């Protein structure tokens, strides 16, 4: 009984071994089984994604590469991933499968005829042939000539309407009724200018003026 109590006291005195930062931890894997895989850092890589991809913890990756923050992986071109032999074989198989998929699905190259068609189509959109340019220029000149002739004809018709004696219906109200209904005006327009004639009254008045001048 005493021996059991003494053994228990010694266990309490020793206590459990506390772990602190930097202390060594025993693992079930030997150094021969742990391998370091080299991973080329890509623009979209994250520390969490790499840990899930290779089946390791983020602390192991940071410890193997001496990283202090999660965002400092882009400071290096490549990272070392600690992995066991089974994990390394699995990652090699995944890389080989990805390579075979890329090799098995060749990129379809466009045919020569399609290239020529697309190039010809682009040239037609960007540039215009001289024949098309001249035909378009002729069309524009023809349209402008037609518009000019139409304007000239409209001006001539308007001038002839103003020069006619009757005039347009809208201008009849502006004319004086004496010019429209005077028979003397119509007679003068038909016979022409009337010669000057000396009447007897005018001759007597002139003779009377001559007598007064003599006196």
Swiss-Prot record:
Tell me the segments the record calls region Disordered. Answer: 86-133, 148-203
Q: Which InterPro entries match?
A: LYSM1-4, LysM_dom, LysM_dom_sf
| LysM domain boundaries | 37-81
Q: Which residues form a coiled coil?
A: none
Pfam families according to UniProt: LysM (PF01476)
What spans are recorded as compositionally biased (Polar residues)? 86-103, 173-189
Name assigned to this protein: LysM and putative peptidoglycan-binding domain-containing protein 1
Organism name: Xenopus laevis
Q: Kindly list the organism's lineage.
A: Eukaryota, Metazoa, Chordata, Craniata, Vertebrata
């Amino acid at each position: 009984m005493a021996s059991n109590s003494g053994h228990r006291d010694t266990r309490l005195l020793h206590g459990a071994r506390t772990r602190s930062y930097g202390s060594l931890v025993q693992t079930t894997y030997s150094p021969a089984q742990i391998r370091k895989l080299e991973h080329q850092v890509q623009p979209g890589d994250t520390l969490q994604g790499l840990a899930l991809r290779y089946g390791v913890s983020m602390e192991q990756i940071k410890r193997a590469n001496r990283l202090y923050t999660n965002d400092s992986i882009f400071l290096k071109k490549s990272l070392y991933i600690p992995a066991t032999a089974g994990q390394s074989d699995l990652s090699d198989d995944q890389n080989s499968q990805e390579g075979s998929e890329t090799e098995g699905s060749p990129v379809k190259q466009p045919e020569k005829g399609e290239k020529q068609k697309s190039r010809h189509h682009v040239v037609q959109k960007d540039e215009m042939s001289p024949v098309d340019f001249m035909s378009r220029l002729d069309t524009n000149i023809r349209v402008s000539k037609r518009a000019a002739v139409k304007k000239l004809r409209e001006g001539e018709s308007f001038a002839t309407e103003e020069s006619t004696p009757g005039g347009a219906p809208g201008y009849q109200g502006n004319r004086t009724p004496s010019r429209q209904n005077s028979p003397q005006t119509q007679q003068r327009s038909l016979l022409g200018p009337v010669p000057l004639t000396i009447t007897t009254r005018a001759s007597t008045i002139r003779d009377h003026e001559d007598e007064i001048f003599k006196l």
